[in-house]
């Protein structure tokens, strides 16, 4: 991503593809972040680095990075649901196996309530993930169709509707 001359905000950013074997780029610093460390976030400094424009000028942030973010957010939401399911399964198994005062601790109201709340949040997160993925899929399908042929006015309205829904729901799903 690179800012274009004469712009002051994210609307002026363009996206470029760069071959690191050509040199000219240094990593200034790596961000220290919480969560998944397999994909580092870093600040890059370019010095006479040759790159190819990716897509259209000044649409790097708005169109391309946001599309990448929506995909990444869905992936994070799916990981969250999977981890939550595993945690619930472990907690449930433990509550059934662990005995206290001659009975399984799942029979104690406080433990049962904790597991019920955990299951409710898990089911809500899964539903949010599936609905968000549905919105993204419909938007992408209409986007693909628009590259093949001109969309009807109704299809264009649907495309805008599902783009807004996808853009609204993906940050929610990520924060599950």
Task: Outline where the language-model segments fall.
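Short C-terminal domain-edge/linker segments immediately following a structured domain
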Residues: 9-14, 46-49, 74-78
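Gly/Lys-enriched N-terminal cap/neck module of very large, oligomeric protein machines
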Residues: 15, 30-33
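A glycine-rich, basic-preceded beta-loop-alpha segment at the flavin cofactor/substrate interface
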Residues: 19-28, 40-72, 89-107
